[in-house]
Amino acid sequence: MADKEAAFDDAVEERVINEEYKIWKKNTPFLYDLVMTHALEWPSLTAQWLPDVTRPDGKDFSIHRLVLGTHTSDEQNHLVIASVQLPNDDAQFDASHYDSEKGEFGGFGSVSGKIEIEIKINHEGEVNRARYMPQNPCIIATKTPSCDVLVFDYTKHPSKPDPSGECNPDLRLRGHQKEGYGLSWNPNLSGNLLSASDDHTICLWDISAVPKEGKVVDAKTIFTGHTAVVEDVSWHLLHESLFGSVADDQKLMIWDTRSNNTSKPSHSVDAHTAEVNCLSFNPYSEFILATGSADKTVALWDLRNLKLKLHSFESHKDEIFQVQWSPHNETILASSGTDRRLNVWDLSKIGEEQSPEDAEDGPPELLFIHGGHTAKISDFSWNPNEPWVICSVSEDNIMQVWQMAENIYNDEDTEGSVDPEGQGS
């Protein structure tokens, strides 16, 4: 009987998701300056824009690249580099250009050739997360279903993977007992990599000190302060010795690598009422960071007074698995997760007065809800070269590259204002 009820609930949920998607699709011309939807061969659990951009002469687009991965059923997995053509400002976006056979938005021009897989490198199991090293973006670290963290220099691998399926990382980083997701390169110390694991620990490696012969590198330091699965870890963006970690013990911990105590953080705070899944330091303000949680909220923190939560962002209907500050705007951050939504928030709007109708759509700081995904969003990334462009990937193989309409974030233009869910006012 329970099975029948579950099947009925699933069918109802699927119908609701499809209806919501139809409404979203109909409203895309009002909501977005760009939408590209691409069905990947396999779902990617990870997404990160590479920092380079190519602007070909005489063309109305620029070429950007993404680090992706695969999560296959039982087939060979790959670390993937893809290229994406983004239109220049003067190229016209035509939201009506929807290819129903491919299930893709062209976004602009014709559909073909906008998103291409450039490099595939054999990987051991699915790619839980992949992140490039800021000082040398050819070097990419990955989290695997085993306990090892792998490091690849993609310039040393052929663009087509070896058919044998053999995974040949340039380095293999040892120290964890279990898999995990959190991964962070130090932006100020080349080669310093942090990793968070289900084994309750955080490992630190320094790959710049590796002898040329050795492929296996042991962790330089293992931090053991958390009492449950460590979900995410992140270096501070300005202080080379500071990093933060969050875990299923509901805590946010701030660590200093100069301290000799690897089992006790500098600060520990009960951050949420459920597991804490992600954190992000603000790139413009050295004291501000955000955490996202299974309690469906994003919390805002000030390192100078962690006893006091600055703000709680509330609109998500389920667990939050990713939070990222905008690289271009100090007050903008985005969050995503199980509810299939990516929310963009604006701190500067906290506390603004709202009409009762507006309040129904969400708090004033909720700038935009991206409703284009019909499955859990696994990861997303702000484009470092094109403001307001985001790539998001979901569990149903879909990758979307999108940019909200300028009138939503530019307050000067009050004409044709659009509420965040896309029902135009």
Swiss-Prot record:
This is Histone-binding protein RBBP4-B. One of its GO terms (molecular function) is histone binding. Belongs to the WD repeat RBAP46/RBAP48/MSI1 family. One of its GO terms (cellular component) is ESC/E(Z) complex. Its main location: nucleus. It comes from the Eukaryota. Pfam families: CAF1C_H4-bd, WD40. SMART domains: WD40. Keywords: Acetylation, Cell cycle, Chromatin regulator, Chromosome, DNA replication, Nucleus, Repeat, Repressor, Telomere, Transcription, Transcription regulation, WD repeat. One of its GO terms (biological process) is regulation of DNA-templated transcription.
